């Protein structure tokens, strides 16, 4: 399995590969750098079939198809140059096991088709076509987060060394899978981590959170538990600020208030507002 690093020419590209390097070093896994071309290079981007009635329109159609094909060849060449440049940076950062892939389709399609070869997917909060407004997520990123069967690390614009982490925890299945992953893989070993539970009564913690803490500590992690109250996104992000943490980890499917963290509007709000990178577990399998 590999760490998938999805890169493009957005301002997040450098942060993506730097986070991927950090994950790869923590877990001792190779990196695959992937650049996705939304428009297949083998087909024209527009349908000109209606122009067949007239010779001059037929000539115009053929010229436009030729230009489309030329544009696609340019995009492929530029994509390969991007992959080569980032692969060189990754190797200079100390990762020797690096592969590259140019994929024609969508990011979500690639991850779904190759989930069995991926341990963690690393993506930027917004792609090169999403604009620069920090209040919005790229539509492709939101689609990936909601459908992925692998943990997705949505990175901040700049890489900051991970010295502390916050795990948003509830009693649902997804949080259990998150704890299992963190106990099995040394991603947060050596990094003080807070398990944070949000409820109406911050003083009353479920007994299961102590079990989760013990499970993680047995695996070698340094863990504390914390109860919070209030709106979920506000409470979690405040815990991140208070730590202060450079990484937030959140499961997706629970039956408590954390449930809305990743499957409803609260998730979008949290990802938009978070100034740190967020590792999201949705349907880990």
Pin down the residues of each PLM region.
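Alpha-helix-centered segments that form part of catalytic cores
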Residues: 66-88, 98
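Gly/Ser-rich helix-loop-strand patches that form or flank binding pockets
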Residues: 13, 17, 26, 100-159, ...
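A short, acidic, amphipathic alpha-helical segment used as a generic capping/interface helix at domain edges
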Residues: 213, 231-242
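Short Asp/Glu-rich motifs
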Residues: 43-44, 109-110, 134, 164, ...
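Conserved active-site histidine-acidic residue motif and adjacent donor-binding/catalytic loop
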Residues: 105-108, 228-234
């Amino acid at each position: 399995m590999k760490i998938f690093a999805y890169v493009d020419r957005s301002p997040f590209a450098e942060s993506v590969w730097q986070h991927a390097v950090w994950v790869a070093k923590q877990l001792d896994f190779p990196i695959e750098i992937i650049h996705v071309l939304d428009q297949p290079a083998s087909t024209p981007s527009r349908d000109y079939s209606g122009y067949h009635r007239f010779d001059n329109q037929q000539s115009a159609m053929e010229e436009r198809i030729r230009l489309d094909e030329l544009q696609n060849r340019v995009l492929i060449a530029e994509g390969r140059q991007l992959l080569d440049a980032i692969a060189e940076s990754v190797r200079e950062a100390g990762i020797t096991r690096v592969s590259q892939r140019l994929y024609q389709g969508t990011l979500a399609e690639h991850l779904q088709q190759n989930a069995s070869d991926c341990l963690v997917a690393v993506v930027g909060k917004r792609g090169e076509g999403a604009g620069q407004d920090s209040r919005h997520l790229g539509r492709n990123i939101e689609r990936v987060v909601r459908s992925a069967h692998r943990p997705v690390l949505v990175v901040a614009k700049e890489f900051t060394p991970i010295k502390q982490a916050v795990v948003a925890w509830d009693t649902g299945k997804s949080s259990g899978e998150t704890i299992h992953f963190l106990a099995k893989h040394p991603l947060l070993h050596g990094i003080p981590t807070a398990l944070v539970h949000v409820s109406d009564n911050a003083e009353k913690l479920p007994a299961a959170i102590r079990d989760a803490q013990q499970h993680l500590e047995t695996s070698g992690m340094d863990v504390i538990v914390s109860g919070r109250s209030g709106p979920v996104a506000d409470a979690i992000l405040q815990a991140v600020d208070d730590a202060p943490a450079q990484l937030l980890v959140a499961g997706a499917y629970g039956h408590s208030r954390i449930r809305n963290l990743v499957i409803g509007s609260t998730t979008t709000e949290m990802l938009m507002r978070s100034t740190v990178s967020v590792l999201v577990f949705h349907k880990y399998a």
